Curated annotation (Swiss-Prot):
The gene is rlmN. GO terms for biological process: rRNA base methylation; tRNA methylation. It catalyses: adenosine(2503) in 23S rRNA + 2 reduced [2Fe-2S]-[ferredoxin] + 2 S-adenosyl-L-methionine = 2-methyladenosine(2503) in 23S rRNA + 5'-deoxyadenosine + L-methionine + 2 oxidized [2Fe-2S]-[ferredoxin] + S-adenosyl-L-homocysteine; adenosine(37) in tRNA + 2 reduced [2Fe-2S]-[ferredoxin] + 2 S-adenosyl-L-methionine = 2-methyladenosine(37) in tRNA + 5'-deoxyadenosine + L-methionine + 2 oxidized [2Fe-2S]-[ferredoxin] + S-adenosyl-L-homocysteine. GO terms for cellular component: cytoplasm. Keywords: 4Fe-4S, Cytoplasm, Disulfide bond, Iron, Iron-sulfur, Metal-binding, Methyltransferase, rRNA processing, S-adenosyl-L-methionine, Transferase, tRNA processing. This is Dual-specificity RNA methyltransferase RlmN. It is found in: Cytoplasm. Its EC number is 2.1.1.192. It is an enzyme of class 2 (transferase). CDD domains: Radical_SAM. PANTHER family: 23S RRNA METHYLTRANSFERASE, RADICAL SAM CORE DOMAIN-CONTAINING PROTEIN.
Amino acid sequence: MSEQLVTPENVTTKDGKINLLDLNRQQMREFFKDLGEKPFRADQVMKWMYHYCCDNFDEMTDINKVLRGKLKEVAEIRAPEVVEEQRSSDGTIKWAIAVGDQRVETVYIPEVDRATLCVSSQVGCALECKFCSTAQQGFNRNLRVSEIIGQVWRAAKIVGAAKVTGQRPITNVVMMGMGEPLLNLNNVVPAMEIMLDDFGFGLSKRRVTLSTSGVVPALDKLGDMIDVALAISLHAPNDEIRDEIVPINKKYNIETFLAAVRRYLEKSNANQGRVTIEYVMLDHVNDGTEHAHQLAELLKDTPCKINLIPWNPFPGAPYGRSSNSRIDRFSKVLMSYGFTTIVRKTRGDDIDAACGQLAGDVIDRTKRTLRKRMQGEAIDIKAV
């Protein structure tokens, strides 16, 4: 469990009330204790909040009237609102969600046997990966716990209300939306705790995945805070290419990154002994057969499966998508080494909801100095 201090600065709303979506179960129990109530009341309220997506205390029928009145005075359940919805021809739904004066994007991806929700962790991103639309928007701020878990809450409420249309309930959550999750550990971890909690969304730890570009000290800290599935945004077979397309590699190179991944795997049960490697396919940049051989050699000591991701274009990007034939040749080389290799099916690209296309609406774009400061905060273990 994380130990984020509950203070008015990080959980109160503009109305001076506590937003209960900001609290994991440990914090919720402390909140009810401060109200003079038994801890089980926290469990009851969480069940209403997350099992039934209820944000009205009056509808919580197993809570006595006096306590409901007390809760209405000091607390609320306020998830961020959907301000725009786009539906893809393949069933994918993208929601633009208001977080203060900005927007982030959340994507619902239904499949035959599951439904995955792609969740954002920051408004914008500080890492400046060259092939990603989010990075081109700059960085504004971290999302609060309520703004992260609130994306899941809002999506679950919408999908739950639309069961008659055949939409599947959310079975998987991936922290692969806007932002670098490891640069916002103090909010991302409590949000994931709620996803896993039986009184929260009750997801299996194997069905909650965090994706990172390689903030190594924060990855080491993550392993001591929570156990979830891990995916890494590698995207290159060597440091020369990765330095160019994933600039954080200049600080934490591939060898350092993969060593941290192996340390995480030693602690984790959620990963079942292997990590997911994400590798975006950029035409004549990182997609040659020689690159595939280099990648296989690079990963020989890291138990993994490899997801090859056809690059999804956005305006002004300097890259092209690898052809199907180049992706096929690349994949066959990896499989010849015995790697489980999957070519990810592109979903939602007609509504700019595919991997690397999320942009949101970042207001007051910050300059490079703030991005450097943001990276420094994550690298300083005391600050994450």
